[in-house]
């Protein structure tokens, strides 16, 4: 009398189920985007919504903040894009386009999700005003240096004047 344990088909089904159990987690992991991949997808969305003539390409990606492991939770991102020489109507990937000389630079901030199936982002971009911020930092540092130098000069004058005063001997 044959039992089901001795059946070769039961062994095959067990093997198939075991293999499916091993493959399914890999399929789920494959659906999670890296931080940079999620940003690049957001840039594709920015290019699709843009009314500018040319595509934008990633110029600088700020360091990835510490995040939880949930790919469905929106992750904060900030990055800079620069205008390329490729027209927006082209089917080319922005990564294949050269940056336009003196092209417009935009600073972008918002959130992305790493879940490829959701593929959601909420990004807003503004003209990059870091040049003005750098100029402000330059003037602030210059003012600090001038202030320190002025104090040093005043102290030297005081020291000089103290040495000019005749000393009376007691």
Swiss-Prot record:
Keywords for this protein: Antibiotic, Antimicrobial, Cleavage on pair of basic residues, Disulfide bond, Immunity, Innate immunity, Secreted, Signal
Keyword Ribonucleoprotein: no
One protein family per Pfam: CAP18_C
GO molecular function, one term: lipopolysaccharide binding
GO cellular component: extracellular space; vesicle
PTMs per UniProt: Proteolytically cleaved by proteinase PRTN3 into antibacterial peptide LL-37. Proteolytically cleaved by cathepsin CTSG and neutrophil elastase ELANE.
Disulfide bridges in this chain: 86-97, 108-125
Gene Ontology biological-process annotations: antimicrobial humoral immune response mediated by antimicrobial peptide; defense response to Gram-negative bacterium; defense response to Gram-positive bacterium; innate immune response; neutrophil activation
UniProt keyword annotation of Secreted present: yes
Localization per Swiss-Prot or TrEMBL: Secreted; Vesicle
Residue positions assigned to the propeptide: 31-131
Region feature Active core, mapped onto this chain: 150-162
Domain comment quoted from the record: The cathelin-like domain (CLD), which is the propeptide part, does not seem to exhibit auto-inhibitory function, as it does not inhibit the antibacterial activity of antibacterial peptide LL-37.
Functional note: Antimicrobial protein that is an integral component of the innate immune system. Binds to bacterial lipopolysaccharides (LPS). Acts via neutrophil N-formyl peptide receptors to enhance the release of CXCL2. Postsecretory processing generates multiple cathelicidin antimicrobial peptides with various lengths which act as a topical antimicrobial defense in sweat on skin. The unprocessed precursor form, cathelicidin antimicrobial peptide, inhibits the growth of Gram-negative E.coli and E.aerogenes with efficiencies comparable to that of the mature peptide LL-37 (in vitro).
Family: Belongs to the cathelicidin family.
Annotated protein name in UniProt: Cathelicidin antimicrobial peptide
Native species: Nomascus leucogenys (Northern white-cheeked gibbon)
